[in-house]
């Protein structure tokens, strides 16, 4: 099953779909293949990190005070501490995915919720953040080879991945229902509320698998759930605004981003409820990912917990409109998607 965001937003504020994709792809391509990107979104050495800078309206820019916590940086592996740098990998190539990770409006700076949490963690650890951009598959090659210390790239915690990697969780892995703001319907965590509805979902995705399971249950109860597919997000959003579908079911970050983009449009959308990407038996989690045995998961988790306890974490999520994916505690290697999932 897919364990990375499987739905990509097609619009950036003030840009046509074609221009937006060209902008993202061009900016990322300008960084080379698997390469470094500019990271100038704050000065951790001076005790601050700027969240949402150059996001083209995807986030609310805010500067957070955060400095090294010596008791946590003391936990770092000796080689990482000596280097003075935290090399952070992002599976952002070729085109990026707002609001998670994408090239900012200056065409060179990596921005997004994933980039920003990596910078915050580096600040707590007293390290200079160095961002490296990869394709999704090559991100893991980078971690395996030691080119990357830790990946912050919307990576789902799975038991399969624990064979090679260690995790520090920092966000819930949620799916969401997007509806017109004028539509009072709510999911409320109950599949029975889908009876009589028409819902769009991406073909071949984890969310489609979940929706098909609900459709089967409803059919057994003599109720109908109509499922539709469209070729791209533009078609999905057109169908939603025209009333052809009642809801779109997809990754929560993508939907949260699109909601911000429609806020001032004639037909704004809203979130009608979320559901764990792992299904009803487990809360899926997004986690910082390091090579197994690297000794990085523990200090990274402690850094995240420091940010949770001191308020920067909540402000980071709020800036990116992702507060509904907050965790109360970062955990090292929490239960992940089981080996037999999907």
Labelled PLM ranges:
Residues 155-162, 211-213, 217-218, 246-282, ...:
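A ligand-binding cleft/hinge motif common to bilobed small-molecule-binding domains
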Residues 32-35:
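Bacterial signal peptide processing site
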Residues 41-151:
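Extracytoplasmic small-molecule ligand-binding "clamshell" domains
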Residues 47-70, 123-124, 205, 283-319, ...:
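Extended ligand-binding regions for polar small-molecule ligands
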Residues 172-179, 263-302, 323-342:
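Periplasmic-binding protein-like
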